[in-house]
């Protein structure tokens, strides 16, 4: 069996919340994989994030103008504003950026047998003997991640990962930063208990081969950033009896045909060794 049980979890810790993702695969069929994810990261939108959503000053004013019928002179997404703090004065909600994991799926897996180590046993005596041996070797399990463009999102939350592959005796955990690419590894011994006994005639040789299944699994995690709150609007000469307005950012995005969300993809590749076993064969055997 290629993989008995695999758990992948990640979460970030901030005052607003965090991410949790659990991946559980049993057996070979990808359709049997169960992937659960929860959590979010919420923060008032930063100035450098506006470009990601196409809501820099010009396009935002144009979109607000389509909502009201007249392009405003000033528009804000968060406090402070001119002429006092309109968000506090009128109890308006600043525009916040919410980031959530919206999907995770296995996009590939591979398994192939590989020779981890081998050892020659030869009877150099003049009589038949029984030889007992054990063979083991250290191998490296790895986890590596890559990100698509993070689109300038200012996410300060830390990402805490935990990977567990029971069949491969793999358990890797670490804390990282949003958008950071890195590789983590652990060394484990395979074949420690793989003992064997063989009877050799005088001058006879055998080769003990420690083999294992080298496996890899690729998981794509998709995060989506959306906006909520209202745009604070000012008309210097007033408009329809008022100077100040609050337009919901969703309405502005829809009316102005602006980008409604930003998606970021993280690709995680897990590499491990499992199903180790020893084969004792004639020294000159090809397989």
UniProtKB/Swiss-Prot annotation:
GO terms for cellular component: extracellular region. Keywords: Disulfide bond, Secreted, Signal, Toxin. Residues 1-17 form the signal peptide. It comes from the Eukaryota. Contains 2 disulfide bonds. Belongs to the caterpillar 8 family. Its main location: secreted. Disulfide bonds: none annotated. This is U-megalopygitoxin(8)-Mc8. Probable toxin.
């Amino acid at each position: 069996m290629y993989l008995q049980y695999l758990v992948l979890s990640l979460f970030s810790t901030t005052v607003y919340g965090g991410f949790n993702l659990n991946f559980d695969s049993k057996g070979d069929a990808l359709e049997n994989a169960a992937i659960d994810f929860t959590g979010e990261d919420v923060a008032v939108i930063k100035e450098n994030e506006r470009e990601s959503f196409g809501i820099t000053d010009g396009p935002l004013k144009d979109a607000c103008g389509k909502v009201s019928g007249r392009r405003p002179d000033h528009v804000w997404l968060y406090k402070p504003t001119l002429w006092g703090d309109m968000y506090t004065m009128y109890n308006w909600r600043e525009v916040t950026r919410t980031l959530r994991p919206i999907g995770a799926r296995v996009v590939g897996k591979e398994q192939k047998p590989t020779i981890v180590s081998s050892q020659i046993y030869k009877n150099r005596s003049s009589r038949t003997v029984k030889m007992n041996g054990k063979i083991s070797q250290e191998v490296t399990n790895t986890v590596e991640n890559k990100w698509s463009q993070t689109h300038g999102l200012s996410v300060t939350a830390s990402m805490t990962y935990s990977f567990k592959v029971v069949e491969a005796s793999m358990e890797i955990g670490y804390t990282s930063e949003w958008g950071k690419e890195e590789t983590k590894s652990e060394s484990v011994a395979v074949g420690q208990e793989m003992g064997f006994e063989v009877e050799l005639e005088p001058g006879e040789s055998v080769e003990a081969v420690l083999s294992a299944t080298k496996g890899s699994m690729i998981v794509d995690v998709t995060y989506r950033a959306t906006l909520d709150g209202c745009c604070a609007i000012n008309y210097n000469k007033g408009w329809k009896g008022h100077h100040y307005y609050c337009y919901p950012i969703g309405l502005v995005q829809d009316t102005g045909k602006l980008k409604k969300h930003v998606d970021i993809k993280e690709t995680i590749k897990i590499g491990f060794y499992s199903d180790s076993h020893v084969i004792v064969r004639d020294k000159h055997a090809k397989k």
